[in-house]
């Protein structure tokens, strides 16, 4: 959700391409008009009609945040096929060059609906795994010695970090929803 390093993104894209070749070996040589054999040129998204660009941007940025929620839930063993399938539907809509407002607006609204389900799933995963959060007073002092600052919202990473540093004299600091 926050990685904008070109080299890292290229490695991820290459990994996706390799997986696609294994799952659907003939896709790249297929002459079907679906267009799934080509990479999507993102620059076309930013040069289209302003209203269409706005709707597709809402879809794109909506599923981008939703993907982070879905990932964190899946790390804790919680998935929902409806959410997974919607990513394909949303990406397909973004890639459709001839879709107008009449087809894109319902997808934008569906992003909100599916995103709500995704947040419910993440809440279920977090509360089942870690318990229901309660207001708690925490010290705001900085202790002497080595420390690690962890930020974000991946509670599993925080759990693993706490386990790895237990009884080693390393202080862990965080903020916001990690508390």
Task: Show which residues each predicted segment covers.
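Metallocofactor- and cofactor-centric catalytic cores in central/energy metabolism, strongly enriched
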Residues: 1-179
């Amino acid at each position: 959700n926050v990685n904008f390093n070109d080299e890292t993104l290229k490695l991820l894209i290459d990994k996706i391409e390799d997986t696609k070749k294994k799952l659907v070996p003939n896709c790249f040589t297929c002459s079907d008009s679906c267009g799934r054999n080509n990479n999507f040129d993102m620059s076309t998204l930013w040069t289209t009609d302003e209203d269409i660009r706005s709707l597709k941007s809402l879809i794109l940025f909506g599923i981008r945040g939703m993907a982070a929620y879905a990932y964190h839930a899946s790390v804790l063993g919680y998935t929902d096929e409806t959410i997974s399938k919607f990513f394909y539907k949303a990406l397909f809509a973004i890639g459709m060059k001839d879709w107008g407002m009449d087809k894109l607006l319902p997808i934008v609204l569906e992003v909100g609906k599916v995103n709500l389900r995704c947040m419910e799933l993440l809440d279920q995963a977090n509360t089942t795994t870690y318990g229901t959060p309660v207001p708690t007073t925490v010290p705001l002092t900085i202790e002497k010695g080595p420390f690690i600052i962890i930020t974000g919202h991946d509670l599993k990473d925080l759990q693993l970090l706490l386990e790895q540093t237990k009884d080693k004299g390393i202080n862990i600091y965080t903020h916001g929803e990690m508390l």
